[in-house]
């Protein structure tokens, strides 16, 4: 933030609102396009909007319980569009507004980022890579059995992304 003037805070607030609208809106469109063929126009659009906001806000709430109890996103375990979009929204929403502002203002020049931004980006990358690898190593002979390589990677990556949320999952960890 590093601003002593109200004008700087107003500009930051505008960027936060615009950024949130862009990220959640884009996610809602992508997810809606995926859900509409399966659930129809109204329900598919609602699911797209709801899951986009839930993922971006790191809430982890889903509406998929109608497919089977506690299913979350298990029926989309191998769906790169759904899982990729939700993962991206979780990560972008999770890194925070100050990091976004720094990325925006410094134009992707890592050397000039705030220490906070550097720590958040490096820690996020390490946790995602480490979590993906560890999940694979621990579950390759359990819940990942029967999945192809692409599905295994997607399941492991999503399982590394979602611990920062309240409850999305794409594999049944209960067995």
Task: Please tell me what each predicted stretch does.
Residues 1-175:
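Membrane-proximal intracellular helices of multi-pass ion channels
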